[in-house]
Amino acid sequence: MSKIQSFGSGVYELELTVPVRSTKFQPGQFLHLTLDDFDPTSGWWPESRVFSIASEPKQTFVTIVYSVKGNYTKRMEDELVVGKKIWIKLPYGDFVIQEKDTPLVLVAGGTGVSPYWPFLLKPRETGAVHLFYGVREENHILFFDKIQILKSQKWFHLHLMVENGSVKDLPYKAGRLSVSEIKNELGEKFDLADFYLSGPPVMIKTFKNDLTSLGIMDSKVHIDEWE
C-alpha cells in the first residue's frame, strides 16, 4: 500500500504498488482485493471484494476507490495503512469501453466514475466523450485535478451534477443526475450515442429502464456489473 487518500464520508482512494514491471488490463475492468493471508500454492483464494481499476494500464501501480458500506470495507478502513502488503488479482470483467465513431456517454454516480479513468486518460485527438457525473457535494468529486486537465480537451465534455452546495473551478449544475437531464444535454446526439453506466445498483437499474423506455437499444447500453 503506497498511498491512501480520504475524501471524507468514508470514501477513500488507494494506490497499490505491484511487484511486476507493469499492470495489464483493459479500461473498465476490475480487480479482487483480499485483506487476509493468501498462499499461492494452495489454490484457495480467501474472502475478497472487487473494485474497478482507476489507473492507467502498463503502470507499476494500480489505483482503486472505495466507499465504506459494509463490514468488509469497514475492515479496509480500519486495517489498511501505507506500507501494508495485501493480495490482489486482476484483471476481470467485460465492462470494456470501446472506441466508436458515435458519441460515447459515460454515466457515473459517486465512486462509479472509477472505471472510466483508464479510458479517459488515453491520448486521443478525435471523437466525442461525454462524462455525466453525479455527486452529493464538492468534496465527493473524485480525481478533481484530472477533470480540470481534461476539460480543456476538445473531445471531452463534462456534465457535472451536484446535489448539495456549490463547486469551485468546475462547471456544474445543481440537482440530481437523470436520464432526462442527459437527453436534454445531448439533444439530437442522444439517439446516436452508446451509454456506459457505473454506480450504485439502484441508479444503474433506473437509468437502464429509462434509456430503454426512450427507445435506446440494449446493445447500446453497457452496465458495470461485477460477477
Which residues make up each language-model segment?
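Short, conserved phosphate/pyrophosphate- and ester-handling motifs at nucleotide-, phospho-/glycolipid
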Residues: 28, 112, 200
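Reductase modules of NAD(P)H-dependent flavoproteins
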Residues: 132, 137-227
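Conserved beta-strand elements of the Class I
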Residues: 103-107, 196
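Histidine-anchored nucleotide/phosphate-binding helix
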Residues: 113-124
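A short, basic/flexible loop-to-alpha-helix module at the beginning of a structural domain
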Residues: 89-101
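Ferredoxin-reductase
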Residues: 1-84, 136-137, 162-164
